[in-house]
Amino acid sequence: MIKQRTLKQAAKVTGIGLHSGKKVTLTLRPAPAHTGIIYARTDLDPVVYFPASAESIRDTQLCTCMINDEGVRISTVEHLNAAMSALGLDNLIVEVDAAEIPIMDGSSSPFIYLLLDAGIEEQDAPKKFIRIKESVRVEEGDKWAEFKPYSHGLKLDFTIDFTHPMITKEVRNYKMEFSAQHFIQQLSRARTFTFMKDVEYLQSIGLALGGSLDNAIVLDEYRILNEEGLRFKDELVRHKMLDAVGDLFMCGYNILGDFKAYKSGHSLNNKLLRAVLANENAWEFVTFDDKAEVPQGYQVTEQVFI
């Protein structure tokens, strides 16, 4: 049986909030089977809890942001979410003492190391997957994202299209068969990116105050401003795929299907997830009693826990 997973022990890290520029402490705590992923604002009295769900995402303007009915929010959850998805975590309490998850270096890599350092523990309950049964597609202008059935795991295909001399045709598309190893090696280190003109505007209205060359790739009209350059020649599209992995994990379950997207972002990713879940014929829950039946991308996950 493929079992649910949580952490062996709590883990804590302190970083900077991307928009506030202030110190943020993140604490990840183990949770019992069937708890799911629950975010919590511990700086508020009483503590405000946010169970992960597609519907909890109500702002996707600059990041993926959870907002409850009272207007309380937790921003920039996507990079941590992607790391939890990659490691197959099912049950976790995510405590944060601010309105946003720390940006760290702008990628998922610090969260991967934090989670692995705490240790992954299997629980005595079957792990549920969402399996796509019918094709679902959403569009916004020329942008689109879709899921199609794919029984062998999660297949990812993402294309970006920006007019910039550094973003040539050769680095606009990335494809990957999802697994913990592939995510860690190919996606986790890909950093968020932005354009200098956008940074200047956001900071003028009190946002992105924690943004810097230490936690984002910044481009001007002609070049990349980071002295160290890129971690991958196609780091930008890899990061967009990382974002999509995190956005799609807002349902709290690993998805089995074929995901393709063109110029998609947080808004369209969430729109696709909502469209899938709203169509009862498009998906089903599945568990695997026999490990031999598990899609290949999820058969090898245990290797990264050693």
From Swiss-Prot:
Source organism superkingdom: Bacteria
CC cofactor: Zn(2+)
GO cellular component terms, semicolon-separated: membrane
Lipid biosynthesis found in the keyword field: yes
EC number: 3.5.1.108
GO annotation, biological process: lipid A biosynthetic process
UniProt xrefs under InterPro entries: Ribosomal_Su5_D2-typ_SF, UDP-acyl_GlcNac_deAcase, UDP-acyl_GlcNac_deAcase_C, UDP-acyl_N-AcGlcN_deAcase_N
Residue sites binding Zn(2+) per the record: H79, H239, D243
GO molecular function, one term: metal ion binding
Active site residues according to the UniProt entry: H266 (proton donor)
Catalytic activity entry: a UDP-3-O-[(3R)-3-hydroxyacyl]-N-acetyl-alpha-D-glucosamine + H2O = a UDP-3-O-[(3R)-3-hydroxyacyl]-alpha-D-glucosamine + acetate
Keywords: Hydrolase, Lipid A biosynthesis, Lipid biosynthesis, Lipid metabolism, Metal-binding, Zinc
SUPFAM superfamilies: Ribosomal protein S5 domain 2-like
Pathway(s) this gene product operates in, as recorded in its UniProt entry: Glycolipid biosynthesis; lipid IV(A) biosynthesis; lipid IV(A) from (3R)-3-hydroxytetradecanoyl-[acyl-carrier-protein] and UDP-N-acetyl-alpha-D-glucosamine: step 2/6
Cited Gene3D superfamilies: lpxc deacetylase, domain 1 (3.30.230.20), lpxc deacetylase, domain 2 (3.30.1700.10)
Role description: Catalyzes the hydrolysis of UDP-3-O-myristoyl-N-acetylglucosamine to form UDP-3-O-myristoylglucosamine and acetate, the committed step in lipid A biosynthesis.
Sequence similarity: Belongs to the LpxC family.
Protein name, UniProt field: UDP-3-O-acyl-N-acetylglucosamine deacetylase
Organism annotation: Glaesserella parasuis serovar 5 (strain SH0165)
Lineage: Bacteria, Pseudomonadati, Pseudomonadota, Gammaproteobacteria, Pasteurellales
